[in-house]
Amino acid sequence: MVVTAELNLSSAKTIEYEQEYSAHNYHPLPVVFSRASGAHVWDPEGKEYLDFLSAYSAVNQGHCHPHIIQALVDQASKLTLSSRAFSNDCFASFSKFVTEFFGYESVLPMNTGAEAVESALKLARRWGYMVKKIQPNEAIILGARGNFHGRTFGAISLSTDEEDSRMNFGPFLENVTAKIPGGSDDEFIRYGEIDDYKRAFESHGDKICAVIVEPIQGEAGIVVPRADFLTDLQELCKKHQVLLICDEIQTGIARTGKLLCYEHSPNCKPDIILLGKAISGGVLPVSCVLSSREIMDCFTPGSHGSTYGGNPLASRVAIAALEVVQNENLVERSARLGKFLQDELVKLQHESNGVISEVRGKGLLTAIVINPEKANGRTAWDLCLLMKDQGVLAKPTHEHIIRLAPPLVISEEDLLKGVDSIRVSLSKLPNVPKSHH
């Protein structure tokens, strides 16, 4: 039997085939991407949209950035994969480049963000037994309520999302949790609340090997902690010989107006950093764990690995993606445009008659919160559908929050178009038919 792929599908056929043949583990907005450039996306019929999601901050450098694509094309004709059974020159170059770029001593290459998280959990446990001398099988890793670190078992063991991430997936990993050790089943470490960490450390500090935290919680709805939270948390971790792991997979690579989001916190440098998404500019799956040589050396040959991690194609693409961040001053651009966008959104909030209850974020990682009572019972999903009709694409997180995170290369003019589309959509929101999402 010869099978032939149908290419160049229409929007309708794309949605039909996806519904019929793929797993139903996502509920996408009814729009189809066919091509993209910078902050602009086109569907198969040629309709143009502004992208205000950036593939969950994976395309910070803009869709199909020519410098990154050229690196991909050049390397693809030379060597794409060696596995780590052998060395390849691109990974060696990437290792030196990425550690110097972010100011760490050692890198572990992986592919997806979830793999980076799992790798860090393994590394932290191994460090806990080898260096901190925690008794066998007793090491604890703590998360925080509202966290999102992926959907693997390690990540959902940390999660507090009982409806989506955890339902019908138990039992979860022992001692990998957002619960306060020794507390009741419904006592979680509250994000940003240093006293909850103190309570956990005072009772179980000798068994805790690591704390993993997002500098800003993304999937929770762009939740920004107080400015010195990470500084205080790291000080507490050092006091109890606990590793601080910062998940920068969504917040890193210039997204928040700093190269890495933790840099907003004074006198803070996490022990382990996790990167993914925009480290490849959205071109290939690339992720990594960055740490000190002392911590990373807890991994020995055979203790961890990945066939594709550190492959030459991904390594070359990641170098090019970080070069774009550097050469195009995307950190400064994100800070400047982020302030511009948030100022415009605050103006819109004041015009919204209470429909927008809050604007929050840092840099170009922003969110608006919808008050359903003022919106006649309509949700963020309803607003996103209206925005789509106005040519702007965003996605809700939870029922009443919309994350707004356009590519960092977006122009002020397009940012204003995006805000105007929200304004028009808000005027229609109270009377639009309710969706059944």
UniProtKB/Swiss-Prot annotation:
Instruction: Note the SS bond partners.
Output: none
Q: What reactions does this protein catalyze?
A: a 2-oxocarboxylate + L-ornithine = L-glutamate 5-semialdehyde + an L-alpha-amino acid
What GO biological process term is on the record, naming one? arginine catabolic process to glutamate
- Nuclease as a keyword of this entry, yes or no, is no
GO molecular function terms attached to this record: identical protein binding; ornithine aminotransferase activity; pyridoxal phosphate binding
One GO location term (cellular component): cytoplasm
Q: Which domain of life is it from?
A: Eukaryota
CDD domains the UniProt entry points to: OAT_like
Entry keyword Ion transport = no
Q: Which InterPro entries match?
A: Aminotrans_3, Aminotrans_3_PPA_site, Class-III_PLP-dep_AT, Orn_aminotrans, PyrdxlP-dep_Trfase, PyrdxlP-dep_Trfase_major, PyrdxlP-dep_Trfase_small
**What EC designation does it have?**
2.6.1.13
Pathway this chain belongs to: Amino-acid biosynthesis; L-proline biosynthesis; L-glutamate 5-semialdehyde from L-ornithine: step 1/1
Q: TM spans, by residue?
A: none
Q: Give the PANTHER family listed for this entry.
A: AMINOTRANSFERASE CLASS III, ORNITHINE AMINOTRANSFERASE, MITOCHONDRIAL
* Protein name per the record: Ornithine aminotransferase
Record the organism.
Kluyveromyces lactis (strain ATCC 8585 / CBS 2359 / DSM 70799 / NBRC 1267 / NRRL Y-1140 / WM37)
